[in-house]
Amino acid sequence: MTNHEQVLTDYLAAFIEELVQAGVKEAIISPGSRSTPLALMMAEHPTLKIYVDVDERSAGFFALGLAKASKRPVVLLCTSGTAAANYFPAVVEANLSQIPLIVLTADRPHELRNVGAPQAMDQLHLYGSHVKDFTDMALPENSDEMLRYAKWHSSRAVDIAMKTPRGPVHLNFPLREPLVPILEPSPFTATGKKHHHVHIYYTHEVLDDSSIQKMVTECTGKKGVFVVGPIDKKELEQPMVDLAKKLGWPILADPLSGLRSYGAMDEVVIDQYDAFLKEADILDKLTPEVVIRFGSMPVSKPLKNWLEHLFGIRFYVVDPGAAWKDPIKAVTDMIHCDERFLLDIMQQNMPDDTKDASWLNRWTSYNQKAREIVLEEMANTTTLEEGKIVSELRRLLPDKAGLFIGNSMPIRDVDTYFSQIDKKIKMLANRGANGIDGVVSSALGASVVFQPMFLLIGDLSFYHDMNGLLMAKKYKMNLTIIIVNNDGGGIFSFLPQANEPKYFESLFGTSTELDFRFAAAFYDADYHEAKSVDSLEEAIDKASYHKGLDIIEVKTNRHENKANHQALWEKIATALKALD
């Protein structure tokens, strides 16, 4: 034992113990040499749960999914060099979707920087503006001051990650050899006795009385709508429905709002707006005087276009994190306050009996007719087209299940075909940067928190993150993956690129012709190809009770999928015009 090893051990023990005291319960470790002391110390901690993922990109998204589902800060640890760069996609997603990650990267000491040392690169501010904060940690030293320094930066990192708006932070640890700390006796036995733990308290932003009264006045007796995009806050669901009923306003609810599957059916929740907001003849009858938007922008493009072209109205965006999430730049009033506070205070202050019943009835009649058509079409569909897959998931998912939704076509199909239901289904997706990478790993991370967990994903997105399946095999995780295999980029069939047949398939369709049964075998997953509605039901039912990884593949045709969507939209448009 050397003095260096003892100093290293005490310094890192102080840092790691403070992470745990501040609320960290899990750490995802990517193996490497320079990060050895941090990895060993984390493994030695008596209450810190560690997961080891050999692929850094997968590890980043696994941590993201776990933090997203648990709403707790999760630690990521890797060695120096390109290992840290592989965390970048997950860091970007965490930043844009406000997920608390604490990224720890090991580094060469200062004397080995910029001198051509192996596995060394400039890691200072590696993630740029995609993290809330960066700290290049000091080298360990034998002093009480440095132990306080380590604990202080540990508490600060958790605080910054968790403070609204939540997000990732990056701490870079330069470490000198030798890299093996002292594990006997346990470095955590007496830790914390010399130095106090930092207690962190949070508050919610509120509005002053004059701002509240102004907003109440602007909304009283007006024709308004709530627009609720991705927002993972269960505590908002019932208060929002109650306020909407009091005002007589519809709630245009994105699948990730939680309002389509929070355990109750309410007519104020509008779930088919994506279909009827396409129709110019209908739009004139649905022009509001007030819009109040919560969460990020919904996935629906027709909804976005409609909101973008509303003029002369009061448009509130409720944004407690001051992130200015208003891509259409329609806001007239930016509200920086806690969402639950706003809902409660408006409920208390809004006068009774000022609503226009005909306004809400117009929305609900359109929505009910569109929903009837969607449900009827799906009930009469006997083949496993993409809409039918989502419709069957809606019917078959058990109460309190989790559903992680892939980007590109899956989230849009869920928007169209997963209408409101009186089951509690927790829907999650990576809608920060909307990438198709890392989705398998994110779902596996979320499966640590929610069970049973299902993943609806496209074939290209699944291919992107097959490495992530190793975590399911290694830790015997329970996840059911439904692959919608349309042999390529199905979303592009709906975009203008589809009108360029000369290059469409080679540049956008990108058929892979992969047989995923071999991927299932490689990672010890139960595989089933569903060729009929009955076989899909059988596979989902079996997977609901099976422990481990299940992969259900459904092969579809992207050209038929586009035609089916268009036929459905046309049928809805015709039916809605007949209502007037």
Swiss-Prot record:
Q: What is its EC number?
A: 2.2.1.9
Q: Which GO terms describe its molecular function?
A: 2-succinyl-5-enolpyruvyl-6-hydroxy-3-cyclohexene-1-carboxylic-acid synthase activity; magnesium ion binding; manganese ion binding; thiamine pyrophosphate binding
| Enzyme class of the recorded protein, top EC level | transferase
Q: What InterPro entries does the annotation carry?
A: DHS-like_NAD/FAD-binding_dom (IPR029035), MenaQ_synth_MenD (IPR004433), MenD_middle (IPR032264), THDP-binding (IPR029061), Thiamin_PyroP_enz_TPP-bd_dom (IPR012001), TPP_enzyme_TPP-bd (IPR011766)
GO process annotations (BP):
menaquinone biosynthetic process
**CC cofactor note:** Binds 1 thiamine pyrophosphate per subunit.
Do the record's keywords include Metal-binding?
yes
Enumerate the Pfam families for this protein.
TPP_enzyme_C, TPP_enzyme_M_2, TPP_enzyme_N
Q: What reaction does this enzyme carry out catalytically? A: isochorismate + 2-oxoglutarate + H(+) = 5-enolpyruvoyl-6-hydroxy-2-succinyl-cyclohex-3-ene-1-carboxylate + CO2
Annotated pathway, please?
Quinol/quinone metabolism; 1,4-dihydroxy-2-naphthoate biosynthesis; 1,4-dihydroxy-2-naphthoate from chorismate: step 2/7; Quinol/quinone metabolism; menaquinone biosynthesis
Q: Give the keywords, sorted.
A: Magnesium, Manganese, Menaquinone biosynthesis, Metal-binding, Thiamine pyrophosphate, Transferase
* Source domain of life: Bacteria
Q: Show the NCBIfam families listed in the entry.
A: menD (TIGR00173)
Query: What's this protein's function?
Result: Catalyzes the thiamine diphosphate-dependent decarboxylation of 2-oxoglutarate and the subsequent addition of the resulting succinic semialdehyde-thiamine pyrophosphate anion to isochorismate to yield 2-succinyl-5-enolpyruvyl-6-hydroxy-3-cyclohexene-1-carboxylate (SEPHCHC).
Q: How does it assemble?
A: Homodimer.
**UniProt protein name:** 2-succinyl-5-enolpyruvyl-6-hydroxy-3-cyclohexene-1-carboxylate synthase
Which species is this UniProt entry from? Listeria innocua serovar 6a (strain ATCC BAA-680 / CLIP 11262)
Gene name, per UniProt, is menD
